[in-house]
């Protein structure tokens, strides 16, 4: 088509047609439609709840909290994760459809926090269970920091290639529900070594002079 013969038509086409890739179009469509699954276990989640109010208004980012992992594409872990909760967290993550993302919020989620030194039941970092996209340190992080983490995640989504992401997740999985948990022998059987228990002497063994004094 000759642009000299049809100047108005050529101008209209230039203003209404754009070329892109299917991958970029998919990333652009997901930027403002993140549906988070809120996994809060302690005080960090209270800071995230502040985003619901009118002061921060996280609806402008397209965040729609979901209660089902099958409808969510973002899981936000906030708080301490224990060994007993680890299989449930992994199951929730595996039930989310692809592509899916993870934000680790707070020191307890990232490293175990103050419980990492003397607690045998605390997971030292949620990235040992599921792959993390954005780390959000703090104890607890402020709502402004949560918004900054969501902004960084949106930038990451806009630049990613879907095939590379799937390949990296399959190679870097640290924990799956297919692992076999060995059930150890219970210690709370009631059969304790009597030698370690304090047994007060019976009254018949105490001399009578002790009572007369």
UniProtKB/Swiss-Prot annotation:
- Quote the record's cofactor note: Binds 1 [4Fe-4S] cluster.
Family, per entry: Belongs to the complex I 20 kDa subunit family.
Function, please? NDH shuttles electrons from NAD(P)H:plastoquinone, via FMN and iron-sulfur (Fe-S) centers, to quinones in the photosynthetic chain and possibly in a chloroplast respiratory chain. The immediate electron acceptor for the enzyme in this species is believed to be plastoquinone. Couples the redox reaction to proton translocation, and thus conserves the redox energy in a proton gradient.
Q: Report quaternary structure and partners.
A: NDH is composed of at least 16 different subunits, 5 of which are encoded in the nucleus.
Q: Which organism is it from?
A: Jasminum nudiflorum
* Parts of the chain that traverse the membrane: none
Cofactor(s) listed in the protein's UniProt record: [4Fe-4S] cluster
**Presence of keyword Acyltransferase:** no
The entry's localization annotation reads: Plastid, Chloroplast thylakoid membrane
Against InterPro entries, the record matches this protein to:
NADH_UbQ_OxRdtase-like_20kDa, NADH_UQ_OxRdtase_20Kd_su
UniProt topology in membrane: Peripheral membrane protein
GO MF terms held by the record: 4 iron, 4 sulfur cluster binding; iron ion binding; NADH dehydrogenase (ubiquinone) activity; quinone binding
Tell me the residue numbers annotated for binding [4Fe-4S] cluster. 43-44, 108, 139
**SUPFAM superfamilies of this UniProt entry?**
HydA/Nqo6-like (SSF56770)
What protein name is recorded for this chain?
A: NAD(P)H-quinone oxidoreductase subunit K, chloroplastic
Q: Name one GO cellular component term.
A: chloroplast thylakoid membrane
One GO process term, biological-process aspect: aerobic respiration
NCBIfam families found in the cross-reference section = nuoB_fam (TIGR01957), PRK06411.1 (NF005012)
EC number(s) given by UniProt: 7.1.1.-
For this protein, what reaction is catalysed? a plastoquinone + NADH + (n+1) H(+)(in) = a plastoquinol + NAD(+) + n H(+)(out); a plastoquinone + NADPH + (n+1) H(+)(in) = a plastoquinol + NADP(+) + n H(+)(out)
Q: Give the chief site where it resides.
A: plastid
Alphabetically sorted, this entry's keywords are: 4Fe-4S, Chloroplast, Iron, Iron-sulfur, Membrane, Metal-binding, NAD, NADP, Plastid, Plastoquinone, Quinone, Thylakoid, Translocase, Transport
What's the encoding gene here? ndhK
């Amino acid at each position: 088509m000759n642009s000299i013969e049809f100047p108005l038509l050529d101008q209209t086409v230039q203003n209404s047609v754009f070329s892109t890739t299917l991958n970029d179009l998919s990333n652009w469509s997901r930027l403002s439609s993140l549906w988070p699954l809120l996994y809060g276990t302690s005080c960090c989640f209270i800071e995230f709840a502040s985003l619901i109010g009118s002061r921060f208004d996280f609806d402008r980012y397209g965040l729609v909290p979901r209660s089902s992992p099958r409808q969510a594409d973002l899981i936000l872990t906030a708080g301490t994760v224990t060994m007993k909760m680890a299989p449930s967290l992994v199951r929730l993550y595996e039930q989310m459809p692809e592509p899916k993302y993870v934000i680790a919020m707070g020191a307890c989620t990232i490293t175990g926090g103050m419980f990492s030194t003397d607690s045998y039941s605390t997971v030292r970092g949620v990235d040992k269970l599921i792959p993390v996209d954005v780390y959000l340190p703090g104890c607890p992080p402020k709502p402004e920091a949560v918004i900054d983490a969501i902004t960084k995640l949106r930038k990451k989504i806009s630049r990613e290639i879907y095939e590379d992401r799937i390949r990296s997740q399959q190679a870097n999985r640290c924990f799956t529900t297919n692992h076999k948990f060995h059930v150890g022998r219970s210690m709370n059987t009631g059969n304790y070594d009597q030698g370690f228990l304090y047994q007060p002497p019976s009254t018949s063994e105490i001399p009578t002079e002790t009572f007369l004094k």
